[in-house]
């Protein structure tokens, strides 16, 4: 009897909450991607790789999808010498420029790279600083045909975990409030919260920039003397929101780390 060929088992199918697959996890070219028009041969393969401009720029690490859409709408992006529009399709043969500078784009099924970095105090989370302070991006390894995008930021005097990725799509998925990704901080205060202050910070909320803000969770972690530790959780982060919430109830933050 002739031996039957060995079959490789299929990988299990991923199940996403609500059946909604995020953009960064969808196939990007290759098997499973939508085929473009153009018939057989090289021309058909080339057409099949054409994708929306803002999506390709985001997955290539040139910013989050929302920021890139703003840049395109404001006329900062050109494709083959013409000002781009939202929804334009591009392929590997197109020349895309951002503010007049040719940028590299990544097509295909390559997965995004992700990097964890413990930010010490005394570093900023932007690429350029008028005061020439140290930046976290100077410490990251170089990547070819892409660049690192920071998933959130920490204050200059705050230490803790930062996540970087080469995919703007993934960064947007983790940062956008509608996905409700939790951010946890360990905060050291000068003083102890009263039950009324805890209720204000977790239920009633404090107005910041015309909007009610509150912690999703607040846990007392104890302490000694006037120094007291709390762990707080937010599902979206405004500029210095943790510090401003505690200042609103009269307590000064003297230390914080992103958990």
Region roles according to the model:
Residues 19, 26, 34-256:
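Basic, flexible Lys/Arg- and Gly-enriched helix-loop patches that mediate nucleic-acid binding at interfaces
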Residues 1-29:
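Mixed-charge, low-complexity intrinsically disordered regions
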